[in-house]
Regions:
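Iron-sulfur-associated redox domains of electron-transfer enzymes in respiratory
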Residues: 1-189
């Protein structure tokens, strides 16, 4: 809309670590662009390919990524953020959300020690932490795996303010659509 282009002619292809994203693009709640533009059939993403599929495609086409000359591109959303770098790790969504909440409620960036939320990152299938933002103590829980989520849902959840659940061990970085690169030692995660 801002570029004065017909949005129906734009095709959005997302490269994702997760095979579930292929099914998610058809979900009704994931068509905000269509709702905004009153185009019922429009989805936020038209196609999803996994990183594994992208690697396979590059190999099939004989592409050597190291020999490709960098070029300029139209950066619609900017270069990225620190939160974006950790988002695909177990605990990364939680940390990114807490960073944002801190900035909104406190009106400033959190101190460096606030970002050391090591208790919420890593490969344990359940982690908990408490943080203080704007004078309020917040209890958070990070889970991965449906078994851990099922156990959590059977408990009294009333003491928690925010819960993150990811299906894969370690988060999206270990998704089924990622290239096979062996197991990540727990100490390196």
């Amino acid at each position: 809309r801002n570029n004065k282009k017909d949005s129906r002619k734009t095709i959005v292809v997302s490269i994702m670590p997760c095979t579930a994203k292929k099914a998610e693009i058809a979900r009704e709640e994931l068509c905000d662009a269509g709702k905004l533009l009153n185009i019922e059939e429009m989805r936020d993403n038209d196609y999803v390919i996994t990183t594994k599929e992208l690697v396979q495609w590059c190999k099939e086409e004989g592409m050597d990524l190291g020999k490709i000359t960098p070029s300029k591109y139209d950066s619609v959303l900017g270069e990225g953020t620190g939160a974006g770098m950790i988002f695909g790790n177990t605990g990364g969504v939680m940390e990114a959300a807490l960073r944002t909440v801190y900035r909104v409620l406190e009106g400033k960036e959190a101190p460096a020690d606030f970002y050391q939320l090591r208790p919420v990152r890593g490969l344990n299938n359940r982690k908990e932490a408490e943080v203080t933002i704007a004078g309020k103590n917040l209890k958070v829980c990070i889970l991965y795996g449906t078994a851990a989520a099922e156990e959590f849902l059977a408990e009294d959840m009333s003491g928690y303010h925010f819960v993150e659940v990811m299906a894969c061990p370690g988060g999206c970085i270990s998704g089924a659509g990622q290239p096979d690169c062996g197991s990540v030692p727990v100490s390196d995660a």
